[in-house]
Structure formats: structure tokens, C-alpha cells
């Protein structure tokens, strides 16, 4: 019996490890889409047309419009975020989307939105087009990229250092979740520079690429943040262990003296992924410097303060500057658990597939995928030719 139990446990660990690698990989169809659109950019003048057209350029900094920022290298995911936002809007012509991507994806991303116009204003920018965003100006970026401990942690052997005989599958799954390579991507950290990236904007809504918008979001601009910087849904009021019952103790190592001295383990956490930012209020605070300071301290302490991505330093940097918004604005967890209540999903303004089981991957939950796929245009030639099939 002990032998069988050990084999079952080892099999579960193997399953979790395979799932982790599946979640980290780029699906073949999405990779194909990026390559074909990049090729189109070089051969088709229509794919290179200016976005937005010259007469609309002043609207990119017009504060009477609703500005959304999306940072991603996933073209298909970006198209779903933009399409769902526009289709759910009562006034799509008042929407401005600022899409930020990396250098390798820029041409393909630009091609997609140039060839598939929508009734909103679209801007596509590559990180390489922000002159001030260099490793010299932001030294912590170079440190994050080149730190050996970080490279080993996110790209090394995920079994070494894990005592499988003394851990549970649940704990092992949590550790794997914390080791996703996307957590050290500059595209993931870029939101901390929003005031510098958009110096003329007063407010902006930041959206992750694994969300779907189901309701008009224009009322977000009417929410009084009461002088705070970040309007976000709190994630400490629910009962499920994966998503909505998170406090600072879930993210930080309180045996570290610097953490124990500065933070309260019972303080409520909040969600990244759909945030309304008051950029005017933000510019008066030193949020970015605090973020950088704690990133550096965690590097110095060999990642012993926290492991999981960009949320922990943001929890510290925005401490005292977060205004809770109604939970119906942002429902999380669709990439974690397959028991998600479909009726609750239908009522949420924004649903978030945070977690490993993304709707565009093979390990996405079947009953939650149609809410995402209904915003994919399967008649599009590029999507058909890359065999991105409707499930």
C-alpha cells in the first residue's frame, strides 16, 4: 500500500510538472500567427499603415476619452481583450487602446490591428520605442534579467531543491505557479512605469492579456478614488484558497526580518489585472522608487522575501494608495479552478483567467473556454491558416 501511495504521489507530481511546462509554452498556432503577421508587415503596405491615422493622433492624449493600456506579446489574446472591450462598450468610439509589446512581436501586433480595424482608436508601441526605458535608466531591469539566482529559479530544474517526500501536491503546485518565466518579463513589470509612458494622461485602466470584458467599463472613470492611486478589487474576502482569500502572509516570507519589520501579515491583498490608475495622483508619490527598492532588496536576499512575480513588490509600493472597488468589476481564478460558478462568470464585468489554465492553451478548462473563444474571429484567414480551431 505504501508503495502504491508513493507511486500515485509521484504520478501527481509528474502531472503538475507537465502542466507547468504546458502553461509556460507558446501554443503552435499562436506562434504561427505571430510569424505570419510579421511576414505580412514586411510585404503588405496595408499592414504597415500608421496606427492611429495622423488626424487621430491628438486623441492619444485626450483625457475626455477612455484610455486602456494592455501589455502583451500574445497577439490572439490582445485581440480578444480589445474585441471584448469594444463590443461590451456603450460608446466604443470613445475608447483608446494603448497596446505595448516587445520588439520581436511589434510587427505582427501592428499588422493584426492595421488589417482588422475596429470602432476604437488603437496605438501599438514596442518597448524599444520608449527612448527613456533603457537598462541604464532603469538598472533594476538589468539586475532582474542577469541575476543568476533568478535565471536558475525560473529556468532551472524545478525538482532540485524540492523535497517531494515532505511536500503535498497542493504545495508543489503553488511552487510551480511561482516559477512561471512570465514573472521576470519586462512586459509584466512595465505597468509600474505608466505615469512616465503616458505623461499627458490623467487616468488609465490597465488590463492583463488573459481577461475578457463583458460589461461597459466607462463607469470606472466615474469612480471617486478619494485621492488614492490604484482602484482594485480586494482579494481577502472570499473563502477559496487559490484566489480570493489572500493576505500579505500568502505572498511574503515573514521570517525575513525586513518583511516582518515593515509589513502586516494580515493586510488585505488586491488584484492586478484590471486596475484603474489615477496617474495625476501617482506622479505625486514615489511608488516606482519604492518598487525598485524592494526588488533590489529581494535580489540581495537571494529571493527569500517573496517568489511570485510582480504582485508582491506592487503590494508594498502601492501600500496606502489602493481604493477598493466592487468585486463585480473583476472576477479572478478562471485559470486556477474548474469549479468556477458559470452564473457568477456571466455577471462579472471582467473575468480573469489568471493561473496556468489559459483559455488559448490545451490545458484550459473546457467549460470556461467558450466565454473567451466567442471573441475570436475563426473566419479570419490568418487564424484559419494557423489552424487555431474553435473548441
Residue map of PLM features:
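Glycosyltransferase catalytic domains, chiefly GT-A lineage
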Residues: 1-391
Amino acid at each position: 500500500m505504501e508503495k502504491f501511495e508513493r507511486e500515485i504521489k509521484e504520478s501527481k507530481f509528474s502531472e503538475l510538472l507537465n502542466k507547468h511546462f504546458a502553461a509556460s509554452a507558446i501554443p503552435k498556432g499562436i506562434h504561427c500567427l505571430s510569424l505570419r503577421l510579421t511576414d505580412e508587415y514586411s510585404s503588405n503596405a496595408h499592414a504597415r499603415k500608421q496606427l492611429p491615422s495622423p488626424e487621430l493622433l491628438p486623441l492619444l492624449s485626450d483625457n475626455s476619452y477612455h484610455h486602456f493600456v494592455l501589455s502583451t506579446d500574445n497577439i490572439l489574446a490582445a485581440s480578444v481583450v480589445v474585441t471584448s472591450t469594444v463590443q461590451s462598450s456603450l460608446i466604443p468610439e470613445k475608447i483608446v487602446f494603448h497596446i505595448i509589446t516587445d520588439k520581436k512581436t511589434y510587427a505582427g501586433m501592428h499588422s493584426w490591428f492595421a488589417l482588422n480595424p475596429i470602432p476604437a482608436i488603437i496605438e501599438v508601441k514596442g518597448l524599444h520605442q520608449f527612448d527613456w526605458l533603457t537598462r541604464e535608466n532603469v538598472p533594476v531591469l538589468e539586475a532582474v534579467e542577469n541575476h543568476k539566482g533568478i535565471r536558475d529559479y525560473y529556468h532551472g530544474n524545478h525538482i532540485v531543491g524540492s523535497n517531494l517526500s515532505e511536500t503535498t501536491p497542493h504545495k508543489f503546485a503553488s511552487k510551480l505557479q511561482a516559477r512561471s518565466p512570465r514573472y521576470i518579463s519586462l512586459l509584466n513589470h512595465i505597468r509600474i512605469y505608466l505615469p512616465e509612458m503616458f505623461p499627458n494622461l490623467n487616468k488609465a485602466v490597465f488590463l492583463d492579456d488573459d481577461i475578457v470584458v463583458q460589461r461597459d467599463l466607462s463607469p470606472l472613470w466615474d469612480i471617486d478614488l478619494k485621492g488614492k492611486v490604484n482602484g482594485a478589487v480586494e482579494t481577502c474576502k472570499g473563502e477559496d484558497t487559490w484566489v480570493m482569500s489572500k493576505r500579505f502572509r500568502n505572498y511574503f516570507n515573514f521570517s525575513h526580518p525586513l518583511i516582518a519589520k515593515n509589513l502586516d501579515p494580515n493586510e488585505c491583498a488586491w488584484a492586478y489585472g484590471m486596475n484603474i490608475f489615477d496617474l495625476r495622483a501617482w506622479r505625486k508619490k514615489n511608488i516606482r522608487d519604492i518598487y525598485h527598492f524592494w526588488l533590489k532588496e529581494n535580489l540581495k536576499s537571494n529571493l527569500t522575501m517573496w517568489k511570485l512575480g510582480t504582485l508582491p513588490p506592487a503590494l508594498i509600493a502601492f501600500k496606502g494608495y489602493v481604493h477598493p472597488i466592487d468585486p463585480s468589476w473583476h472576477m479572478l481564478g478562471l485559470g486556477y479552478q474548474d469549479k468556477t460558478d458559470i452564473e457568477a462568470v456571466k455577471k462579472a464585468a471582467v473575468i480573469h483567467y489568471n493561473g496556468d489554465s489559459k483559455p488559448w492553451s490545451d490545458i484550459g478548462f473546457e467549460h470556461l473556454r467558450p466565454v473567451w473563444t466567442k471573441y475570436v474571429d475563426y473566419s479570419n484567414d490568418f487564424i484559419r491558416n494557423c489552424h487555431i480551431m474553435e473548441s
